[in-house]
């Protein structure tokens, strides 16, 4: 994976902790919108969204980032340098850092939904934080929305759906719940 031993995508001078996790949450709330990644020319599929935001935040704040690549399982980090990127210009601002964007594109090309379950660095889903009985509210507007109910959390990498949801719909009636 790392073809050369010199150079880094970026130098991490900070470390993840609870304070940085709170700052990440706040940054997402302030910056993540439907057009953010498009405005910055970042191609995505569904899993790429989670990876891209985490890596962008890490790059901005000089935090480490690491994920396992699909297929090989190799660890790809902010210190993983490929020979093709050595001469690629960097910049202070992440959106102008061509080396970072090349590395991000490589990461997004080599990860997918199944790598997320055991690879949400550094925070994994834990039963203490998300468990049966939790609710998810999707409020479309002041008048309409959708509620989903967490039935079970299965933290087993062989299980295809780690979070099991129960949901109903409108109109109100006696029905089998969607699972």
Q: What does each model-found stretch correspond to?
A:
Residues 47-51, 65-84:
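Acidic helix-start/capping segments at beta-turn-to-alpha-helix junctions
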Residues 141-147, 162:
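Extended serine/threonine-enriched, polar tracts that run as long, contiguous segments within proteins
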Residues 145-156:
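Short beta-strand-centered aromatic/proline hotspots
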Residues 158-179:
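Short solvent-exposed strand/turn elements
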Residues 1-48, 55, 63-69:
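Active-site-adjacent structural segments surrounding the nucleophilic cysteine of cysteine proteases
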Residues 54-61, 111, 140:
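Sec/Tat-exported extracytoplasmic proteins
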Residues 79-133, 143:
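Conserved active-site-adjacent core of cysteine acyl-enzyme catalytic domains
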Residues 135-138, 164:
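Hydrophobic beta-strand signal
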